[in-house]
Amino acid sequence: MFRKLNALLWLRLQVLISNSTLLATLLMPFGITILQNEFLNKNGELNMFLLSTSLTMVLSMGSGYMVSIMMAEDKEKRNLKSLILSGVTATEYTFSMLVLPMLIMLLGMILLPIYLKVDLSGYLFAYVIYLILATISIIFLNLLIGAVSDTQSKAQVYSIFPMLIVSFLPIIALQNDTVQKLLDYSFIGPFVGLLKEGGGELSLGNLGLLLSWVLVLGLACLFVLKNSYKGK
């Protein structure tokens, strides 16, 4: 099993390195954050806001978008068929898709607060749990998109909508109460709310909401992937 996972992770890394567009999209949130901080946040008053928006961009562009593109590329280049014939299961394939996006999110979780000088010591546990569960949710969502996309071009088109929604929903919610309610019940709502309030304890309600998202999207993802396997 570990040999298969190592081979799958190596394949993911090779796809990432060879795809300049994907690599640029992955790095874009960090570049945008640096530019915004240098030109719009000279007094440090927007540190918390920039952290919230930058993390949602890392989620959507870094951890989410890359998954659907990689999945679609596997199908387009018939890598998925080769993996099936080599004995890789849907569960192993899904797990291999979690690793790189999670590492990218962990990098953002650690480096962005340090760069923006945001002290998370009072609510670090809630911050980590909310973000990890949100990351798993968006990975599952993009796996679904990749599973129903026959080509990378289709995956790019289908992925752009959730990417834009996740990236800009918190900003639009500041001006619209209806959008704010949608945000509250989304998988990014708990950590956006945590940063907006400047702290807080781990909420059982928010935890239940995030676990529900993970469960629903995870089951849907495995169902679609297993059907994809049967169809090959």
List the predicted regions and their residue ranges.
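N-terminal Sec/SRP start-transfer signal
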Residues: M1-T21
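Hydrophobic alpha-helical transmembrane segments of multi-pass membrane transport/permease proteins
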Residues: Q14-N41, L50-M66, Y158-P170, G208-G218
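Transmembrane helix segments
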Residues: L35-K42, V148-I188
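Hydrophobic alpha-helical transmembrane segments of multi-pass membrane transport proteins
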Residues: N47-P113
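Short alpha-helical transmembrane interface motifs in multi-pass membrane proteins
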Residues: S52, S60-Y65, F95-S96, G122-Y130, ...
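Alpha-helical transmembrane segments and their short interhelical loops
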Residues: A90, L98-D150
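Junction motif at the cytosolic side of a transmembrane helix
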Residues: L144, L211-K232
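Terminal transmembrane helical anchor/hairpin motif
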Residues: P170-L215, L219
